[in-house]
Amino acid sequence: MRTLIREHRKELGLTQEELAERVGVTRQTIIALEKGRYSPSLILAHRIARALGREHIEDIFILDEDGAK
């Protein structure tokens, strides 16, 4: 799975720390998510999408063709 967290975060002018605070996670978690090293729970994915002004997690998280992480 790949994410568009970094792109949407920068579009909003947010730092990793600011996004982390909005979502309720550490900056390290945001870094891991942006680098594709961590797959979030469904609840966390929804929190991130909302924090980035998106209604659908599919706007942020993109499943690979084969469904792999």
From Swiss-Prot:
GO molecular function, one term: DNA binding
DNA-binding region residue numbers: 16-35
Pfam families attached to this UniProt entry: HTH_3
Domain HTH cro/C1-type: 5-60
Gene3D superfamilies attached to this UniProt entry: lambda repressor-like DNA-binding domains (1.10.260.40)
Keyword Transcription: yes
Annotated PANTHER family: DNA-BIDING PHAGE PROTEIN (PTHR46558:SF4), TRACRIPTIONAL REGULATORY PROTEIN-RELATED-RELATED (PTHR46558)
Designated name of the protein: Uncharacterized HTH-type transcriptional regulator MTH_1328
Organism annotation: Methanothermobacter thermautotrophicus (strain ATCC 29096 / DSM 1053 / JCM 10044 / NBRC 100330 / Delta H) (Methanobacterium thermoautotrophicum)
Lineage per the UniProt record: Archaea, Methanobacteriati, Methanobacteriota, Methanomada group, Methanobacteria
